[in-house]
């Protein structure tokens, strides 16, 4: 199991059920592993905010999973990547190309960081997905929708 480095005592870390993600109790930082896919997934289409989950797509063509760092930090998703290509032209002159990528965005407050996944498609699409936590039974029954319905059914005198 990988653990995210922390200056907290070892008793302050809790292991996640996801074998490659660990969180510290105080600052909630997690590094997500980037899985390389062998084919483009049909599910990787657009950035999506849904009621039960989250998906973000980023163009990262040319990067390998090892060159990308995907982290969840205090309710934000942060993706960074850096790579360098060096070579020599036929005329003997050298070249160096540096490429960087950086994307940061806020995550839904009820998103479960331990259930997030990250994959890189052959076409260079980095896709990060996550599911929202289930509401406790008491909140699910008395959620905002049920409260609004009960108010709307009252008759005014």
UniProtKB/Swiss-Prot annotation:
Keyword S-adenosyl-L-methionine: no
InterPro entries, sorted: A-crystallin/Hsp20_dom (IPR002068), HSP20-like_chaperone (IPR008978), HSPB9 (IPR042940)
Keywords for the protein's UniProt record, in alphabetical order: Cytoplasm, Nucleus, Stress response
Region (Disordered): 1-20, 136-157
Primary localization: cytoplasm
Domain of life: Eukaryota
Comp. bias intervals (Basic residues): 148-157
Database matches in SUPFAM superfamilies: HSP20-like chaperones
GO cellular component terms listed in the entry, alphabetical order: cytoplasm; cytosol; nucleoplasm; nucleus
Localization annotation: Cytoplasm; Nucleus
Keyword Cytoplasm: yes
Pfam hit, one: HSP20
Sequence ranges of Low complexity compositional bias: 1-17
Sequence ranges assigned to domain sHSP in this UniProt record: 35-148
Family: Belongs to the small heat shock protein (HSP20) family.
Protein name: Heat shock protein beta-9
Gene for this chain: HSPB9
């Amino acid at each position: 199991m990988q653990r995210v480095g922390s200056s907290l005592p070892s008793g302050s870390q809790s292991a996640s059920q996801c074998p490659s993600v660990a969180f510290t109790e105080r600052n909630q930082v997690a590094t997500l592993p980037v899985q390389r896919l062998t084919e483009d997934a049909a599910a990787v289409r657009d950035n999506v905010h849904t009621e039960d989950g989250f998906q973000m797509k980023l163009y990262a063509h040319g990067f390998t999973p090892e060159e990308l760092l995907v982290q969840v930090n205090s309710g934000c998703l942060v993706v960074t990547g850096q790579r360098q290509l060096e070579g020599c032209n036929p005329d003997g002159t050298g070249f160096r190309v540096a490429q960087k990528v950086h994307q940061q965005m806020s995550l839904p407050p009820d998103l479960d960081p331990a259930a997030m996944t990250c994959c890189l498609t052959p076409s260079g699409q980095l896709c990060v997905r996550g599911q929202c936590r289930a509401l406790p039974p008491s909140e699910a029954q008395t959620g905002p929708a049920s409260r609004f319905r009960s108010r709307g059914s009252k008759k005014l005198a």
